[in-house]
């Protein structure tokens, strides 16, 4: 599904097209794997302010000047506490296997009784995007964001508000109309 979405949204990028083509031939659903190694990095003082960095094991075919592109992944789950960045781990692993770094972030989520959390959530996502620029061997000019559901909403907000714009922003099934989502009792 991820590869098909990438294919329908992006047609100009050589490295994205290569990624799509190679994964179509191989299929994303290989034998079940043991969790790929990643580096967990705390980027803030709160326990939820961390990201897992997945880097290719081998030299990336997308390397330019020693740096590779990175996709910052923002998970969905209606901003609720029980949904974590673990939802995006398979995509992070697939990207790293294809030669693209993945920065799978966590952010503040709400639990029953919380109010006004979404502004903290947006702050977390903006801060994580800033931290991505400090990572070694990352090509910031070709770095992207991708979010699903609530993460898609956050990806759209980040793309609109960030001073350093992502090369590409992908919002998978974003919650783009918060009023309609609330009226429909989606969360």
Located regions from the model:
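N-terminal cap/lid segment of alpha/beta-hydrolase-fold proteins
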Residues: 10-63
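Short, surface-exposed "cap/lid" segments of acyl-processing enzymes
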Residues: 59-66, 71-94
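Catalytic metal-binding/acid-base residues of hydrolase active sites
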Residues: 78, 108, 175
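Catalytic nucleophile-loop/oxyanion-hole region of alpha/beta-hydrolase
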Residues: 82-91, 103-141
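Short phosphate-binding/catalytic loops that engage adenosine nucleotides
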Residues: 100
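Primarily recognizes the serine-hydrolase "nucleophile elbow" in alpha/beta-hydrolase
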Residues: 127-186
